[in-house]
Amino acid sequence: MSGNTGERSFADIITSIRYWVIHSITIPSLFIAGWLFVSTGLAYDVFGSPRPNEYFTENQQGIPLITGRFEPLEEQNEFSRRSQ
């Protein structure tokens, strides 16, 4: 048989009024803050990822796929020149 650590049981915590008063405010607040973080575009700025309309340039609408086995550096340089 295990000893008592003096901590409240999980059932006691989630059935208490105090738990639900605190979490009925914090859980929706976190959800709304996350939604605003993404919907305003701040997530793109913070993490440095391109926005959906910035993945490809106007003259390049596909991924730069290197197909040459023996000349990959030349193909990469060609893709770089085309994208500028």
From Swiss-Prot:
One of its GO terms (cellular component) is thylakoid membrane. PANTHER family: CYTOCHROME B559 SUBUNIT BETA-RELATED. With its partner (PsbF) binds heme. PSII binds additional chlorophylls, carotenoids and specific lipids. The keyword Disulfide bond does not apply. GO terms for biological process: photosynthetic electron transport chain. This b-type cytochrome is tightly associated with the reaction center of photosystem II (PSII). PSII is a light-driven water:plastoquinone oxidoreductase that uses light energy to abstract electrons from H(2)O, generating O(2) and a proton gradient subsequently used for ATP formation. It consists of a core antenna complex that captures photons, and an electron transfer chain that converts photonic excitation into a charge separation. It is a single-pass membrane protein. InterPro entries: PSII_cyt_b559_asu, PSII_cyt_b559_asu_sf, PSII_cyt_b559_CS, PSII_cyt_b559_N, PSII_cytb559_asu_lum. This is Cytochrome b559 subunit alpha. The chain crosses the membrane at residues 21-35. GO terms for molecular function: electron transfer activity; heme binding; iron ion binding. It comes from the Eukaryota. It holds the Pfam family Cytochrom_B559. Heme binds at H23. Keywords: Electron transport, Heme, Iron, Membrane, Metal-binding, Photosynthesis, Photosystem II, Plastid, Transmembrane, Transmembrane helix, Transport. Belongs to the PsbE/PsbF family. Heterodimer of an alpha subunit and a beta subunit. PSII is composed of 1 copy each of membrane proteins PsbA, PsbB, PsbC, PsbD, PsbE, PsbF, PsbH, PsbI, PsbJ, PsbK, PsbL, PsbM, PsbT, PsbX, PsbY, PsbZ, Psb30/Ycf12, at least 3 peripheral proteins of the oxygen-evolving complex and a large number of cofactors. It forms dimeric complexes. It comes from Cuscuta gronovii (Common dodder). It is found in: Plastid membrane. Its cofactor is heme b.
